Amino acid sequence: MNPEKFILELSKHNFVLTDKQKEQFKLYFKFLIEVNEHVNLTRITEENEVYLKHFYDSITPLFVFGDVFKDGATLCDVGAGAGFPSIPLKILKPSLKVTIVDSLAKRLTFLKDLIAKLGLDNVELVHGRAEDVGQNKLYREKFDIVTARAVAKMSVLSEYCLPLVKKDGYFVALKGPKAEDELDEGKKALAVLGGKLIKDEELTLPGTTEERTLVLVKKVKETSKKYPRQAGTPRRKPIC
């Protein structure tokens, strides 16, 4: 998917990019590849692949769960790495107020420089483990939307993300193909943490056979104060 095809595909979903947005994606790609030479940010480095598997993939929730991403909504991205999905979402929806949580300082340095280059405002970077941030009263149950892409399986991911979602807010997980087993396995964790599965939708990346699953969870009750547990525990002993 070259930049022109990317622009065309977005227009099919009623997203017509401005010149500024086109330039932001172009700068994003260039800076990602430049920094990736000395900081391990991504294995995907070819332009067509970055536009498809990072940029397009990151914004698919806007096509499927568009009503969730209201103007001015607060969004927390857990384990964003090189900024996916939150930075592409922010480029398309500039009114989003974004907080990015990541445990690696090198990635946050890249993101700080990227945000400046792209001229983005209302983006906060938080250095820490999701388990610790989820117990911090500055962030706990403060967000309308929490996103995570390719971070952990659903039973673990729910414990990272749901404590950050405010009641009646949403957790959006960007998963790979055939996530049914993972969703079944994660049902108990969702219930324990105050979440309710609203929808899971499969889609195929344009021009490929690569499948993705988008998962929408609503926060229907507050999360018990005992969650998230100590850093490392959710991965070692998932709720199941």
Swiss-Prot record:
Domain of life: Bacteria
SUPFAM superfamilies cross-referenced by the UniProt entry: S-adenosyl-L-methionine-dependent methyltransferases
Cell location: Cytoplasm
Keywords: Cytoplasm, Methyltransferase, rRNA processing, S-adenosyl-L-methionine, Transferase
InterPro entries (alphabetical): rRNA_ssu_MeTfrase_G (IPR003682), SAM-dependent_MTases_sf (IPR029063)
Major localization class: cytoplasm
EC number annotated for this UniProt entry: 2.1.1.-
Gene Ontology CC annotation, any one: cytosol
Binding site for S-adenosyl-L-methionine: G79, F84, A130, E131, R149
MF (Gene Ontology): rRNA (guanine-N7-)-methyltransferase activity
A Pfam match: GidB
Family: Belongs to the methyltransferase superfamily. RNA methyltransferase RsmG family.
Role: Specifically methylates the N7 position of a guanine in 16S rRNA.
NCBIfam families: rsmG_gidB
The protein, known as: Ribosomal RNA small subunit methyltransferase G
